[in-house]
């Protein structure tokens, strides 16, 4: 596979784009195709602006060498592991999926802050800018993107200096649903195979971390905006069941660590409880649910009051040690 890797530069441009990112407003045009192109352009500018704040090592475009997919905007940003010693040792890897109701992406606290923390703790981190409904995408675009990201990481493990047997995923809110799909659908919904891509590597992540995740598409606890953005107009009960993660846990589900706050006002925390119950019923090993009394929604990896009170990232780190991803 020939990787399409770009390196960002130009601090003055980044300063301008950072201001643009903070101030930008959504603009609606009459022509849908034009909106799609403009939305993609705005997203690219937004990501470039954030590189001024969070240095990255490379931008890897997912679909540049795939026939019929070359114009797709999906990209992941690599942050190399910071190693204090033994620089020849392969690092574990994590692919990060920000949330945003499958409509947009929460880049700061859920994306780049996460990448920074994982990088500082010995992981090579890939922050995935997957396609969303803001640019008029629905399923299977999102699942295609995360499966493609896993494929690229594993096929290029030697070049990236990572351990191909320690490739995990973490996702927030709707991104939590996406990484759970990656953990459940790597065989039953192989979207790359449908595109004629023979991966030659496993699409099964080695660990899954859904944080305050969207889980269920069932009417009683579904996050309606995420469901609409993912499924589009076809929201039949069959589709709701198919994409309710608590109903589809396979026997070979990866180890899963679920994090949620009980006072979450956006995504009902019972989403997390249902997923965990399903994991337990399936006897999936090394699964854990951590429910915090408060924290609401969207705390991500920002070192604010919630992080200082509960140190959820350090609790995650201990679990990663327990499952032998890190020492």
Regions found by a protein language model. Name each.
Residues 258-260, 264:
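Short beta-strand/loop motif that positions the catalytic acidic residue
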Residues 151-222, 240:
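Primarily recognizes the serine-hydrolase "nucleophile elbow" in alpha/beta-hydrolase
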Residues 56-89:
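N-terminal cap/lid segment of alpha/beta-hydrolase-fold proteins
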Residues 269, 273-277, 281-327:
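C-terminal catalytic histidine-bearing segment of alpha/beta-hydrolase fold enzymes
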């Amino acid at each position: 596979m020939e990787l399409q890797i770009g390196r960002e530069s130009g601090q003055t441009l980044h300063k301008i784009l950072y201001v643009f990112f903070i101030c930008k407003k959504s603009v609606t045009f009459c022509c849908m195709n034009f909106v799609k192109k403009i939305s993609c352009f705005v997203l690219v500018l937004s990501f470039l602006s954030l590189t001024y704040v969070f240095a990255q090592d490379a931008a890897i475009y997912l679909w540049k060498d795939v026939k019929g997919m070359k114009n797709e905007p999906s990209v992941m940003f690599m942050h190399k592991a910071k190693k204090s010693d033994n620089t020849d040792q392969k690092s574990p890897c994590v692919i990060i999926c920000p949330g945003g109701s499958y409509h947009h992406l929460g880049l700061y606290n859920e994306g780049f802050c996460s990448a920074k923390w994982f990088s500082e703790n010995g992981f090579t981190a890939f922050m995935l800018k997957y396609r969303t409904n803001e640019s008029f995408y629905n399923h299977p675009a999102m699942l295609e993107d995360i499966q493609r990201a896993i494929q690229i990481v594993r096929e290029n493990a030697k070049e990236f200096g990572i351990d191909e047997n320690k490739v995990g995923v973490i996702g927030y809110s709707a991104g939590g649903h996406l990484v759970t799909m990656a953990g459940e659908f790597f065989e039953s919904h192989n979207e790359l195979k449908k595109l004629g891509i023979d991966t030659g590597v496993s699409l099964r992540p080695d660990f899954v971390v859904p944080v305050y995740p969207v889980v269920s598409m069932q009417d009683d606890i579904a996050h309606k905006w995420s469901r609409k953005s993912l499924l589009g107009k076809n929201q039949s009960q069959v589709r709701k069941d198919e994409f309710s993660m608590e109903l589809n846990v396979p026997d070979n589900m990866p180890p899963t660590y679920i994090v949620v706050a009980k006072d979450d006002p956006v995504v009902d925390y019972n989403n997390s409880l249902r997923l965990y119950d399903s994991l337990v019923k399936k006897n999936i090993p090394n699964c854990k649910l951590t429910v915090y009394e408060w924290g609401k929604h969207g705390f991500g990896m920002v070192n604010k009051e919630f992080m200082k009170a509960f140190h959820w990232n350090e609790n995650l780190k201990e679990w990663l040690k327990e499952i032998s991803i890190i020492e």
